[in-house]
Regions:
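Residue(s) in the substrate-gating loop at a strand-loop-helix junction
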Residues: 146
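Alpha-helical segment proximal to the catalytic Tyr-Lys
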Residues: 131, 175-176, 235
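Substrate-binding pocket helix/loop in short-chain dehydrogenase/reductase
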Residues: 102-103, 110-115, 207
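Short, small/polar-rich loop/turn modules that mediate ligand/substrate recognition or access, typified
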Residues: 87, 178, 183, 237-239, ...
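Conserved glycine-rich cofactor-binding loop
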Residues: 18-19
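Short C-terminal tail/terminal secondary-structure segment
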Residues: 1-3, 151, 227, 238-251
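Active-site helix of classical SDR
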Residues: 126, 162, 170
Length: 251
């Protein structure tokens, strides 16, 4: 008899689940026995490939296009998930954007878009998830934060601010939802080699050399933290941030 996975039979929804860390998390959850809704926004082929990979692992999956900044779109996303899977055990708020620009070159639209994707998106998705999870009297919400929410980075003002806000959101939401059996935590990765960060190759190499582990992280380096926070093993974790960052910061 095959050994049950840590997430056997659970139903997960991962925003931005078609690429990068989100895709790796969706696949890791499937490998541990979960069925997954892959929410995507820009590339249907990536989403379809992720779904196919999950199905190849013996789990069920659907891909749903969603704009996490839109209340109507988020409502439709969660309706699609519920119609297919009936319940929601795990939400991963991973959808995000990143842009490097100096303060004087940052438009109000740039600023508001960054905050909308990271903060409004997490708010809308968490609110929708909480409705389902309260009925079940249990659930897990995992927010994808960033070490830049702690230390900032020049020319990443909007992104660093959004991620700092998401850290505060994670802690406050954890205190609100814990009495309902819903555990909210976050993962704050360091620089991960996914192509998401606009740093040059030379800058990434220099950054890697500065780390105690002397290399950038990979999506696979991130997934154990996400599996842990979605599993029963994290039953006493509430409002906590895990830091897979190669030792760059040690909060």
């Amino acid at each position: 008899m095959a050994k049950a996975g840590k997430l056997d039979g659970r139903k997960a929804l991962v925003t931005g689940g078609n690429t990068g860390i989100g895709r790796a998390v969706a696949l890791a959850y499937a490998a541990e026995g979960a069925d997954v809704t892959v929410a995507w926004h820009a590339d249907p082929k990536e989403a379809e490939a992720t779904v196919a990979a999950i199905v190849a692992l013996g789990r069920q999956a659907i891909a749903v296009r969603a704009d996490v900044t839109s209340e109507a779109s988020v409502a439709a996303l969660f309706a699609s998930h519920r119609k297919r899977f009936g319940r929601l055990d795990i939400l991963v708020n991973n959808a995000g954007i990143q842009k490097s620009q100096k303060l004087e070159k940052t438009t109000l639209a740039d600023w508001e878009r960054m905050l909308a994707v990271h903060l409004r998106g997490a708010f809308l998705c968490s609110r929708a998830a909480a409705v389902l999870m309260r009925r079940q009297k249990q659930g897990r919400i995992v927010n994808v934060c960033s070490q830049l929410g702690y230390i900032g980075r020049a020319e990443y003002l909007a992104y660093s601010t959004a991620k700092a806000g998401l850290i505060g959101f994670t802690r406050a939401l954890a205190k609100e939802l814990a009495p309902a059996g819903i555990l909210v935590n976050g993962v704050a990765p360091g620089l991960v080699d996914t192509g998401f960060d606009p740093l040059s190759t030379a800058a990434k190499r220099a950054h890697a050399r500065s780390l105690p582990l002397k290399r950038l992280g990979t999506p696979g380096d991130m997934t154990p933290a996400f599996v842990f926070l979605a599993s029963d093993e994290s039953r006493y974790f509430c409002g906590q941030l895990l830091h897979p960052n190669g030792g760059e910061i040690m909060p």
